[in-house]
Structures are given as structure tokens and as C-alpha cells.
């Protein structure tokens, strides 16, 4: 399965380059060019770049898809849909999903609420130096600790009682309490088991800023 890096418009102070393909969204394409990385696909309405910058992007990109400014999807959502149409088995890591406009950041965090993207949630990851976000659908899952990360939080999008086992702070039917996000939990000696009754859970692994 191809590994794809998707660069979007938030903060890009940290990223990795061990990918098969690089996709840029709107102005993030310029960042790829600055870094000397290829642009296998450029996607967006490109309303945040000048005409000369767009021409530079079009010249460098192997493929460029320009979308209308008025549309139902964000540029990032559109890019993901195109990626999974081309590569249904792809694993996508998104860089630049955090920072910048809060509405953009929240749209990125809740990307898999889109019915077209929900089937691919296990293959989408949001990443920066301090945070890693992954998604788990309804069912029982083992969550592995990301090397270097200290804390783990769970945000359940759905009804019913989320169950967390094998963590420093377990959540079961015996001690269940409802919160939007169960934050600042920790791994102990191995994976954490999470049981999602319906919907999906957002798993956020983090560490303090050094």
C-alpha cells in the first residue's frame, strides 16, 4: 500500500519524508517546492497564491487539480477524496493540519465525519512534532504507543459508553462518566484496548513542548 504525505496549510515546522508520493494542498505546494520535495499532485482552489505562484506550482507538479473556490469540501477533504479514489489502499499522513485558523484545524481533526472519508479513517493520520491523531471506528481496537509520546486522549464521536482498558486510567461500565474528551491518559506496559460502541473515536497522542 502506498504511503502518501499530504501537506496542508497549517504550521509545517516538523515533517518526515519517507513516503512514496507527496501531495500539496493550495499554498502548501510552495512549501514543498521550498523544501525540494516533489509534488506528485497539487489540489486546491489556490485562492491564497498569486498567479505567478500558481504557474510555478503547475509547472512543478506532476498533476494539478484546480477546484472552484465555492464548494462543499475543504481543499484538504477534496485532496483526501482524490487520493483514495486513485489509491484506495493508501496510508495518508497529513502535515500542517494544526496551527493557523482554528476553523481549519477543527475541520482537519474531524475529517472522517465526512461519509466519503469515514471508510478510510484507519488509514489517515495527522501529525506534527508534538501530536499524532489517529481514528478508530466502531469495534474493539488495540492502540499502540507512538515512540516519544507521553499522553493519550480519547474523543468519542457517537453515542453509548466508550471503554478504555489497559491504560493508567481505565474507563468501564463500573466507573463510566461522560466527557467530550478523556484527556491526559497514559500507557502503562503495553497497548491500550478501546471499545467503541458506535461512531468513531479520535485518539490523540501528545507530549509536552520541549
Regions found by a protein language model. Give the residues of each.
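Anionic-ligand-binding alpha/beta catalytic cores of soluble enzymes and soluble regulatory domains
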Residues: 91-140
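Short coil/turn segments at beta-strand junctions that form active-site/ligand-binding loops
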Residues: 1-2, 20, 88-91, 122
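N-terminal beta-strand-loop-alpha-helix module at the start
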Residues: 1-57
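Short gly/pro/ser/thr-enriched loop/turn and capping motifs at secondary-structure boundaries
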Residues: 29-31, 49-51, 73, 101, ...
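A glycine-rich helix N-cap at a beta->alpha junction
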Residues: 60-68, 121-125, 147-155
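Short phosphate-binding loop-to-helix
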Residues: 65-87
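Long, charged alpha-helical interface segments
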Residues: 129-131, 136-210
Amino acid at each position: 500500500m502506498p504511503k502518501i504525505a499530504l501537506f496542508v496549510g497549517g504550521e509545517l515546522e516538523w515533517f518526515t519524508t519517507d513516503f512514496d508520493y507527496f501531495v500539496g494542498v493550495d499554498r502548501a505546494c510552495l512549501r514543498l517546492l521550498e523544501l525540494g520535495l516533489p509534488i506528485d499532485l497539487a489540489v486546491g482552489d489556490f485562492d491564497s497564491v498569486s498567479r505567478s505562484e500558481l504557474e510555478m506550482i503547475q509547472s512543478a507538479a506532476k498533476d494539478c487539480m484546480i477546484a472552484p473556490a465555492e464548494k462543499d469540501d475543504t481543499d484538504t477533504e477534496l485532496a483526501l477524496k482524490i487520493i483514495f479514489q486513485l489509491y484506495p489502499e493508501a496510508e495518508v499522513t497529513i502535515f500542517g493540519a494544526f496551527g493557523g485558523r482554528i476553523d481549519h484545524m477543527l475541520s482537519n481533526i474531524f475529517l472522517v465525519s465526512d461519509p466519503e472519508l469515514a471508510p478510510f479513517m484507519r488509514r489517515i493520520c495527522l501529525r506534527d512534532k508534538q501530536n499524532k491523531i489517529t481514528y478508530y471506528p466502531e469495534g474493539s481496537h488495540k492502540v499502540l504507543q507512538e515512540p516519544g509520546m507521553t499522553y493519550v486522549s480519547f474523543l468519542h464521536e457517537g453515542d453509548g459508553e466508550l471503554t478504555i482498558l489497559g491504560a493508567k486510567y481505565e474507563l468501564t461500565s463500573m466507573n463510566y462518566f461522560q466527557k467530550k474528551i478523556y484527556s491526559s491518559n497514559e500507557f502503562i506496559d503495553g497497548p491500550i484496548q478501546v471499545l467503541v460502541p458506535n461512531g468513531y473515536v479520535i485518539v490523540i497522542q501528545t507530549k509536552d513542548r520541549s
